[in-house]
Curated annotation (Swiss-Prot):
Belongs to the UPF0462 family. This is UPF0462 protein C4orf33. It comes from the Eukaryota. Disulfide bonds: none annotated. The lineage of its organism: Eukaryota, Metazoa, Chordata, Craniata, Vertebrata. It comes from Homo sapiens.
Length: 199
């Protein structure tokens, strides 16, 4: 499954090589490959590469959201060209109930481009993922740029509206069965069973 982020969050074409994301689901989880321009802005987070870093969204980052649109349970994965990552599990819009989960993430960086490879175990995914969106952020202050695979349609923009990646209504249909066959069933997640018990 290949995706290119070709628009800003509000629907304008990006002015650079688009961020490319490939998802390869397998027996134990999903391999997520990223190829993206490297902007070097803002500077690297202070956290150790290879480790979770809270509020990574304030830096240069590529994000993927996997949503069950009936329950509004979703997985948010953030990957940074400096090696830090952030995995959040949410139940209800913006309602984080688990964060900074460990992640197998490798990246390599050139002068103007970076590539990343993250392994997302099935246990991180909410049951029955039905929708997907992906985002990229870079730049500082008034040069901050927010990009979306599925942006807010321009005719729906409100005056003064700010970028918000948790507008779940703009996510689009997504089905792992397209790659894994109609018979395939998403493995149950112990993590999400725990969340269900906590409610």
């Amino acid at each position: 499954m290949d995706f290119k982020i070709e628009h800003t969050w509000d629907g304008f074409p990006v002015k650079h090589e688009p961020v490319f994301i490939r998802l390869n689901p397998g027996d134990r989880g999903v391999m997520m490959d990223i190829s993206a321009p490297f902007f070097r802005d803002p500077p690297a987070p202070l956290g150790e590469p290879g480790k979770p870093f809270n509020e990574l969204w304030d830096y240069e980052v590529v994000e993927a959201f996997f949503l069950n649109d009936i329950t509004e349970q979703y997985l948010e994965v953030e990957l940074c060209p400096h090696g830090q990552h952030l995995v959040l599990l949410l139940s209800g819009r913006r309602n984080v109930w688990k964060q900074e989960l460990p992640l197998s993430f490798r990246m390599s960086r050139g002068e103007t481009k970076w590539e990343g490879k993250a392994y997302l175990p099935w246990s991180y995914f909410p049951p029955n993922v039905t929708k997907f969106n992906s985002f990229a952020i870079h730049g500082s202050k008034d040069k901050r740029s927010y990009e979306a695979l599925y942006p807010v349609p321009q005719h729906e923009l409100q005056q003064g509206q700010k970028p918000d990646f948790h507008c779940l209504e703009y996510f689009k249909s997504f089905n792992f069965n397209t790659l894994l066959g109609e018979e395939w069933k998403q493995p149950e997640s112990d993590l999400w069973l725990i969340e269900k018990c906590d409610i």
